[in-house]
Swiss-Prot record:
Residues 11-23 have a biased composition (Basic residues). GO terms for cellular component: cytoplasm; small ribosomal subunit. One of its GO terms (biological process) is translation. Transmembrane segments: none annotated. HAMAP family: Ribosomal_uS14_1. The gene is rpsN. The keyword Ligase does not apply. PANTHER family: 30S RIBOSOMAL PROTEIN S14, SMALL RIBOSOMAL SUBUNIT PROTEIN US14M. GO terms for molecular function: rRNA binding; structural constituent of ribosome. This is Small ribosomal subunit protein uS14. InterPro entries: Ribosomal_uS14, Ribosomal_uS14_bac/plastid. Belongs to the universal ribosomal protein uS14 family. Residues 1-23 are annotated as: Disordered. It comes from Rhodopseudomonas palustris (strain ATCC BAA-98 / CGA009).
Length: 101
C-alpha cells in the first residue's frame, strides 16, 4: 500500500489540473496562434509560467485505485498488475482465467 500522503498529493494535483485546464488551454492557444502579435504571445507565455506547476496534466501520476501503487497500472481499469492478479485468483475479474498449457 502506498503512503497516504503520496495518494493525497496526487489527488490534489488532479483537482488543481481540472480547475486550471480551461485557463491553460486558453493561454496555450494564444501562444500557438502565429497571427497574434509577439508581445501578446510573450505575455501569455509569462502568465502560463506563473501558474502553479501542479496545475499541469503531466504532473499527475497514474495510481492503482485499490492500493495506490504508482507503477505498472493498467489504464483500462486503473488497477495494478498485482491487484489484477489478486482479484483474478479470487474470480472477481470476469473473463480472466489462469493460464495453463
Amino acid at each position: 500500500m502506498a503512503k497516504k500522503s503520496a495518494i493525497e498529493k496526487n489527488n490534489r494535483r488532479k483537482k488543481m489540473t481540472k480547475n486550471a485546464a480551461p485557463k491553460r488551454a486558453r493561454l496555450k492557444a494564444i501562444i500557438a496562434d502565429k497571427s497574434k502579435p509577439m508581445e501578446e504571445r510573450f505575455a501569455a507565455t509569462l502568465k502560463l509560467a506563473e501558474m502553479p506547476r501542479n496545475s499541469s496534466a503531466t504532473r499527475i501520476r497514474n495510481r492503482c485505485d485499490l492500493t495506490g501503487r504508482p507503477r505498472s497500472v493498467y489504464r483500462l481499469n486503473k488497477l495494478s498488475r498485482i491487484a489484477i492478479r489478486d482479484l483474478g485468483s479470487r474470480g472477481l475479474v470476469l473473463g480472466l482465467v489462469k493460464s495453463s498449457w
